[in-house]
Amino acid sequence: MSKSLLWDDLEYPIQPWIRSAVDVMGFENMTPVQAATIPLFARNKDVVVDSVTGSGKTVSFVIPIFEKIVQEEANTTKMKKGHFHSLIVSPTKELAKQIHSVFESFLEHYPENLYPIRSQLLVGTNVKTVRDDVSDFMENKPQILIGTPGRILDFLKIPSVKTSMCSMVILDEADRLLDVSFLKDMENIMNILPKQRRTGLFSATITSAGDNIFKTGLRNPVKVTVNSKSQAPSSLKIDCAVVETDKKLEQVISIINNYKFKKCIAYFPTCHSVTYFYSFMQYLLKKGIIKEEIQIYSLHGKLQTSARIKTLETFTETISNAVLLTTDVAARGIDIPDVDLVLQLDPPTDPEVFLHRCGRTGRANKLGKAITFLTPGREEDYIPFMEVKNINLEEISLDIVNLPDNFYEIFKDWLLEDRARLDQAVKSYVAYIKTYSKHAASSIFRLQSFDYVGLAKFYGLIRLPKMPEITKYFKEDKENARTFGEGWLIDPPINMDKFGYLDKKKEDRRLADLKNLKSIHDKKKLKSELKKKNMSWSNNTQSKEEKVERRTKMALKRKRIEEELSKEADENSSGDDEQNRDWKQVILQNKKSKNSNNGMQGSFDDL
């Protein structure tokens, strides 16, 4: 790109306070995407921006929005009550909050003597309702709204909220907003907003949105693409390692114990997995198996909004040796400073998310490393699969260092302390398999070649759960069926009736349920025995006599038929053995003849 990256070389002079803000925030020069996008958007062009993660896309729309608001205020285009100027939509609460914080960071440098510019965050929480958001909106009169699709749609439906003065709309991580999860809400939002507006779509993987981008009301958009041989920034090194399924957790712990990093994000496949492994890793911290200076946090979509925001803030503020266990809720757009290591225990089910996960490190030209685990065999085909998408994975070899040889025994002992941990492990196991079965690259990630036993050990399970996939697996794999036929992974098996919960209320409820089930079982067994016991002697004798009588009658009938057939054969015999007929064949022919007559009778009756 031939454009100058100096702020002073922009086609128009930006506001002095904005220039001051970018200097204080450390943006010495523009990134290529900023140099291309800011002038276009400021000149009232719709834009579709496709650029690698960490390339500064957020600032590309923040500055033009501020410029337009200041310009319109200078032209005495005052914002009426209940109206707003700009709307920014993001797929997650965490990303929305981050964008809001960027706007607020710029506003810290806004002159107090000018007309006030304000922004408001619109995300669903367990504290604030939509009515609360509307009340704040009417009182504070913000020009800029940032939020998630569901909350924004509910907000815009309130009659006191007016949309006719909205002149700029941004879809950050647009490909995610335009997929099936959010498309309906986004269409409804776009229908509420005025047609005469500027629209900007921003993402590192915008091409995956396909024709859905035309549903956003774009008018003669300009596409901004920062040319690169790879989809990943040059500061990001993407590696992969072949790791046995049951060794993945040990490998993660080995890496965070021995690798020098400030912040690490470890991606797990499901919310259940994050919760489960967070508990176990806290236990390993206390045991000294994970180094004491390491701080571990958990974040996933099923946490309450307040807990998610607090966790993200704490992780962001931590200086070093911080590890965040998370799901794809933290895969897109979130810019956490000093993340220099990303671990993926499995590739994401959607290949488009792969680069977003890796892109949490190596941002703003800072060096970063991302490592993805692949299991031996078919999953190794993921490397050439990603090469087609211009993402090069370099295969590396990893060793498990300074961990106890009896790691699985430690895991098992921890699990056996509380039945609630087993429940969580089973939920995590089942959720993992369901997620794995939905992988977009289904030719690579196949349940037919899946390591069910290895996954069970990965979760520290003592017994394989009962589920259709495992039943089918054992039918096809006779060797494992013999080894794990009863599902037990430990020897000797434990008495599940005596395996209880640490929580007294849960345990009391379990014992009551167990007693009830035992009572039902005993009643059924007793009923069956009483039925046999109470059957009269005369009935038993009569039943036996009837059986003998039936057998006698059948024997006499068979003998009579044989005699008749023998007599018929003697009368019609021509001396040729081939014409002698077996009496069984005669009976069969008689039956066929009888059936044929019955069929004929039926057809006549239908006339």
From Swiss-Prot:
Transmembrane segments: none annotated. PROSITE patterns: DEAD_ATP_HELICASE, HELICASE_ATP_BIND_1, HELICASE_CTER, Q_MOTIF. Residues 527-607 are annotated as: Disordered. Keywords: ATP-binding, Coiled coil, Helicase, Hydrolase, Nucleotide-binding, Nucleus, Ribosome biogenesis, RNA-binding, rRNA processing. Gene3D superfamilies: P-loop containing nucleotide triphosphate hydrolases. GO terms for biological process: assembly of large subunit precursor of preribosome; maturation of LSU-rRNA. Residues 248-404 form the Helicase C-terminal domain. It comes from the Eukaryota. GO terms for molecular function: ATP binding; ATP hydrolysis activity; RNA binding; RNA helicase activity. Residues 587-601 have a biased composition (Polar residues). It holds the Pfam family CTT_SPB4. Residues 543-552, 560-570 have a biased composition (Basic and acidic residues). It is an enzyme of class 3 (hydrolase). Residues 38-224 form the Helicase ATP-binding domain. It catalyses: ATP + H2O = ADP + phosphate + H(+). Its main location: nucleus. Residues 529-565 form a coiled coil. It is found in: Nucleus, Nucleolus. Belongs to the DEAD box helicase family. DDX55/SPB4 subfamily. ATP-binding RNA helicase involved in the biogenesis of 60S ribosomal subunits. Binds 90S pre-ribosomal particles and dissociates from pre-60S ribosomal particles after processing of 27SB pre-rRNA. Required for the normal formation of 18S rRNA through the processing of pre-rRNAs at sites A0, A1 and A2, and the normal formation of 25S and 5.8S rRNAs through the processing of pre-rRNAs at sites C1 and C2. Component of pre-60S ribosomal complexes. This is ATP-dependent rRNA helicase SPB4. It comes from Vanderwaltozyma polyspora (strain ATCC 22028 / DSM 70294 / BCRC 21397 / CBS 2163 / NBRC 10782 / NRRL Y-8283 / UCD 57-17) (Kluyveromyces polysporus). The lineage of its organism: Eukaryota, Fungi, Dikarya, Ascomycota, Saccharomycotina.
